[in-house]
Every structure is written in structure tokens, then in C-alpha cells.
């Protein structure tokens, strides 16, 4: 029965109308083998050509044999299959990143315009519930979308409206690790949901319905605010805070790899409402640029000679810049020039001087330009000086001076050290 429902849904939602070569992610489990059977059966009706992609995670002794069998199945079906083996330290995140990077690579090499995965309704309920437990923002409780941009094409999840109990019995591999509670998703699936189902046997559907309502609410708010210019400061500041939050969240959707914390989001909101002509470094090599009329977020470009260039240090990063080695939290041996107290709660910005820079020295704010003049630094030395900034405050200048803000032991948040070592080149 699922076959006809599946075909009907694919046609009604026009999943493949713009796609000819389709990449199917296949693990060998019941979900992906069911999807393989469905897409293979309806290739002509959907006017698609299938290509398979499989990742061998190398975590079970059966993994190599399963990869071999999948290749044999693909050969019998006359479908091309490409495989890759995971390498590195295994975790849920590292494995997921490896998979999707491989899928992007295959899509490009094989000229595929769509990646298809076998996520289903049970996965959707688990995902929403996991996000609730992690304290995700409301918009992310809408769950996975059945289609979204991916790898220059589209990611399609055509089984999201089907429960695993709807799947027919087909040849597949059973992964014994799915029954172990080492990973968060397994604990949700094997422990939390069975407990919740004793209170409400339809808890999964209730969670999915909640996600659907949230998605509808987000869509309604988006439609109601579509005529507002999100990046016009005058328009933005006229809105109530609740509307500002929504507008900023909508704008940040354009940068999926930015991943701001709530504190970082609130900091941007504060800047947009109080600052003018402002330049603020975020994370993951993004920056916020604000003038008197508008603001924008953009990726920081490759390093050049511009004084506006900046480098972001995350906790435990070690880098060499000009004539210095900077180590965030890891002690350097020998020849340490400076030790600046910092916080691991956000990144450190290394940059050159900017107009209006101020530093706290001897208990007073002092213009950086005046400090350089008083200390008789040459113009070249001023231009080459590396500013250490965190929480929008200058904490020091590499090899020159440390701000009182950083020295002040009463700032309990500054419990880590940025080590700066002079390099002889």
C-alpha cells in the first residue's frame, strides 16, 4: 500500500520534476532499502536516474561485508554505487559531517541535482524531541523539512510522512549498535519514547503535529513581515523587540553555518539597537558590518593587506600571525612575551587598529591613537600592531601592552589565558 501512496505524494509535491540524476544515500538499513526499492520501481514514472552513495563507518565488523553486498545489489539492479570509508575520531557529528561532505562531492562529480535520504516520521519525532531537550529556539522545533537547498541542488526527504511501521519487509541489514544507548538519538528511541508512550501512545504524532504548527506559525510571520526591509536600521528599530527577534532570526537563516548561541544573538540585537557605524566579528569567520542606515552579515574574505582583516581564535586554537604565535588556552614553552586573561566563552579577535579604538590603561579609557603617539611608535609599527579583542573590548596589543580590563582579577569570566610568543623569522 505504501507504494501507491509514495508515488502519489512524489507527484503531488513535484519532488523530482526539476531533477533527472538523483543521488540516494543508502546505509543498508530498512529505511534506505525501502526507499531504494520505491525509487527503483518508479524510476520511469518519476523520470529519474538513480545513483547510490554509501558510507562505511568502519565501526562494526560486519561493515565491510555489508558494503560488499550493497555493491552486489547495485550491480544486479544496474545502478551505479559510490562508496567511501570514514576515517578519523568517530562521533555522531564527525560521522554526519563526513557523510554529507561525501554526498556533496559525489553530487558535483556525477552531475546530480538532488540528494535523497530515507528520514521518516519516527526520525522527525526524535529530531524535534532532541532539539527540545537541547533547548533549541522555537523555529528549529519545526523539525526537518521535506526539501531544502543542499550542495548546489536540493535535499529531498520523501518518507517524512511515513512511519517505520508502514514499511514492508525487504532485504536489509540490522545494525546492532542501534540498540545500544551510547548515542543521544538511541537513548531517545530506545528509552525515552517507550516511557512517554506509556502516558500517551501517540506521543510521536503529537510531537510531529507540534512541529507542523510551529512551521505554519513561522510561515505566517514570514508572510506578514515580507515587506519589511530586514537590514534597514530605521525600519528594524521601529519594530517591537519580539518582531526584531523574528526579523533577525529570518535574516540569520541565510547563514546556516554561523550557528550563534543565544548570548551571541542577544549581543547582535543589542548592537543593532544601540550602535552606529560599527564593525563586529562573530564566529566561523563571519562579521557584522553596520553603518548609519543598514547592516549586513558576511563571510570574512581571504587575508589581504587590508587593516580591516581579522582572524578569529577559538578555544585551544594555536596560530602564527606576523611575528607572533598566539595560543588560546594552551601554554607555550619558552619565550612567552605576554599572558592575557581571556574567556573561553567566545572567540578572540586578532586584528589591526581601527578608527575610534580605545584601551583601558591605568584605570582610564585612552584613545589608541593617543597611546601610540605618547609612546612614540612609528606609523609602520602602529599599522602592524596586532590588537587582541574580546567581548568588543581591547584586551591588549601583542608584544606591547595589556589592558586593565584583562588584568582586573575581579572579572571572574576571564579564567583562561591567551599566550603570545615572539617568533624570530
UniProtKB/Swiss-Prot annotation:
GO biological process: tRNA modification
GO molecular function, one term: ATP binding
This protein's UniProt keywords: ATP-binding, Cytoplasm, Ligase, Nucleotide-binding, tRNA processing
UniProt-listed CDD domains: TilS_N
Cell compartments where the protein resides: Cytoplasm
Principal subcellular localisation of the protein: cytoplasm
GO CC annotation terms, alphabetical: cytoplasm
Enzyme Commission code(s) on record: 6.3.4.19
Catalytic activity, as annotated: cytidine(34) in tRNA(Ile2) + L-lysine + ATP = lysidine(34) in tRNA(Ile2) + AMP + diphosphate + H(+)
Keyword tRNA processing set for record: yes
Function of the molecule: Ligates lysine onto the cytidine present at position 34 of the AUA codon-specific tRNA(Ile) that contains the anticodon CAU, in an ATP-dependent manner. Cytidine is converted to lysidine, thus changing the amino acid specificity of the tRNA from methionine to isoleucine.
Cited HAMAP family: tRNA_Ile_lys_synt (MF_01161)
Free-text domain note: The N-terminal region contains the highly conserved SGGXDS motif, predicted to be a P-loop motif involved in ATP binding.
Family under the similarity heading: Belongs to the tRNA(Ile)-lysidine synthase family.
Name recorded for this polypeptide: tRNA(Ile)-lysidine synthase
Organism (species): Streptococcus gordonii (strain Challis / ATCC 35105 / BCRC 15272 / CH1 / DL1 / V288)
Gene of this entry: tilS
Amino acid at each position: 500500500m505504501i507504494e501507491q501512496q509514495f508515488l502519489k505524494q512524489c507527484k503531488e509535491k513535484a519532488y523530482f520534476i526539476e531533477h533527472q540524476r538523483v543521488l540516494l544515500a543508502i546505509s543498508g538499513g530498512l529505511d534506505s532499502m525501502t526507499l531504494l526499492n520505491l525509487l527503483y520501481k518508479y524510476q520511469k514514472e518519476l523520470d529519474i536516474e538513480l545513483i547510490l552513495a554509501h558510507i562505511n563507518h568502519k565501526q562494526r565488523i560486519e561493515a565491510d561485508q555489508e558494503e560488499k553486498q550493497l555493491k552486489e545489489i547495485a550491480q544486479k539492479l544496474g545502478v551505479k554505487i559510490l562508496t567511501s570509508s570514514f576515517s578519523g575520531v568517530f562521533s555522531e557529528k564527525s560521522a554526519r559531517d563526513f557523510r554529507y561532505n561525501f554526498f556533496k562531492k559525489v553530487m558535483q562529480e556525477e552531475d546530480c541535482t538532488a540528494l535523497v535520504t530515507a528520514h521518516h516520521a519516527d526520525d522527525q519525532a526524535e529530531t524535534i524531541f532532541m532539539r527540545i531537550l537541547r533547548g533549541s529556539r522555537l523555529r528549529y522545533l519545526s523539525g526537518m523539512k521535506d526539501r531544502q537547498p543542499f550542495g548546489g541542488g536540493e535535499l529531498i526527504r520523501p518518507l517524512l510522512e511515513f512511519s517505520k511501521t508502514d514499511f514492508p519487509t525487504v532485504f536489509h541489514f540490522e545494525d546492532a549498535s542501534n540498540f545500544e544507548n551510547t548515542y543521544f538519538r538511541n537513548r531517545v528511541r530506545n528509552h525515552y519514547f517507550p516511557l512517554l508512550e506509556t502516558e500517551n501512545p501517540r506521543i510521536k504524532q503529537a510531537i510531529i503535529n507540534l512541529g507542523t504548527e510551529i512551521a505554519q506559525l513561522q510561515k505566517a510571520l514570514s508572510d506578514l513581515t515580507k515587506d519589511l526591509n530586514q537590514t534597514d536600521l530605521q525600519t528594524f528599530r521601529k519594530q517591537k523587540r519580539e518582531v526584531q527577534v523574528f526579523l533577525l532570526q529570518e535574516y540569520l537563516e541565510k547563514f546556516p553555518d554561523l550557528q550563534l548561541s543565544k548570548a551571541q544573538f542577544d549581543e547582535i540585537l543589542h548592537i543593532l539597537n544601540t550602535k552606529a557605524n560599527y564593525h563586529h566579528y562573530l564566529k566561523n569567520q563571519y562579521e557584522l558590518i553596520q553603518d548609519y542606515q543598514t547592516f549586513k552579515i558576511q563571510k570574512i574574505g581571504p587575508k589581504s593587506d587590508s587593516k580591516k582583516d581579522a582572524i578569529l581564535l577559538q578555544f585551544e586554537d594555536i596560530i602564527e600571525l606576523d611575528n607572533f604565535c598566539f595560543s588560546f588556552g594552551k601554554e607555550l614553552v619558552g619565550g612567552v612575551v605576554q599572558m592575557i586573561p581571556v574567556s573561553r566563552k567566545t572567540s578572540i579577535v586578532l586584528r589591526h587598529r581601527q578608527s575610534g579604538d580605545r584601551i583601558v590603561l591605568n584605570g582610564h579609557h585612552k584613545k589608541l591613537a593617543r597611546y601610540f603617539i605618547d609612546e612614540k611608535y612609528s606609523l609602520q609599527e602602529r599599522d602592524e600592531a596586532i590588537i587582541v579583542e574580546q567581548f568588543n573590548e581591547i584586551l591588549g596589543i601583542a608584544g606591547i601592552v595589556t589592558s586593565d580590563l584583562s588584568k582586573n582579577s575581579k572579572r571572574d569570566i576571564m579564567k583562561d589565558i591567551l599566550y603570545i610568543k615572539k617568533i624570530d623569522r
